[in-house]
Amino acid sequence: MNESGRVEAFSDGVFAIAITLLILDIKVPKADGPGGLWHALGAQWPSYAAYVVSFLVIGIMWVNHHQVFSYVARVDRALMFLNLLVLMVVAAVPWPTAMLAEYLREDRASHVAAAVYSLVMVAMALAFQALWWHLTRTGHLFDPRVDAPAARATRIRFALGSLGYPLTVGLAFVSAPLTLAAHGLLALYYGFNQVPVPTREAAAPS
């Protein structure tokens, strides 16, 4: 296994653990009778909503992480530390997810929980952006397929896409459910608009 393969394998393990931990916060409700169980299941909708959104966030982050590292031929010390920074935030996602699910239906507490959740998402976006900027700074870590100057030119586009995350911190003090929905939409945006890794084959005229 090459250097980048070891980093990616370790990262896959962290992503897998973080995404699995999300379901552990959805508890089996206690209720008397079938009707009571349906009511108890419905009352847990904040946990379901928070689980789905955070699953999308981590899952799509993993897809983009895999997309980027499939073009990385070698790693340096800075890249390893930046990748650890990304993983540190990913591993933290179950915590604000559980907090937001717990307080989503409350008034003032829901705003604080949504703001904390949004701040974690901001940290994740900044960490991944720092990793991408380091990779594209010189391009020497990419394999020969990558058009390094073209990859470097995507940094502004990538940064513009991250501007939505700080806005959700302000939205958190307006509506916690809307904040959660906004993070779901941002995750879907990055799901359909993956991190661009321009290759020489794609740039070559047909």
From Swiss-Prot:
Q: Where is this motif: RxxxFSD motif?
A: 6-12
Catalytic activity of the protein: K(+)(in) = K(+)(out)
Which residues are exposed on the Cytoplasmic face of the membrane?
Answer: 1, 71-76, 136-147, 193-206
Q: Where is this region: Short helix H1?
A: 31-34
Q: Which GO terms describe its molecular function?
A: identical protein binding; potassium ion leak channel activity; proton channel activity
Hydrophobic filter residue 1, annotated site positions? 17
Q: Which UniProt keywords apply?
A: Ion channel, Ion transport, Membrane, Potassium, Potassium channel, Potassium transport, Transmembrane, Transmembrane helix, Transport
- Tell me which InterPro entries the record gives: TMEM175-like (IPR010617)
Give the start-end ranges of region Short helix H2: 36-42
Query: What are the site positions for Hydrophobic filter residue 2?
Result: 21
Q: How does it assemble?
A: Homotetramer.
* Record remark: domains: The six transmembrane regions are tightly packed within each subunit without undergoing domain swapping. Transmembranes TM1-TM3 are positioned on the inner circle of the channel tetramer and participate in inter-subunit interactions that are central to the assembly of the ion conduction pore. The RxxxFSD motif within transmembrane TM1 coordinates a network of specific inter- and intra-subunit interactions with other conserved residues on TM2 and TM3 and plays a key role in the tetrameric assembly of the channel.
State the function annotated in the UniProt record. Potassium channel.
Family according to the record: Belongs to the TMEM175 family.
Q: What is this protein called?
A: Potassium channel B446_29190
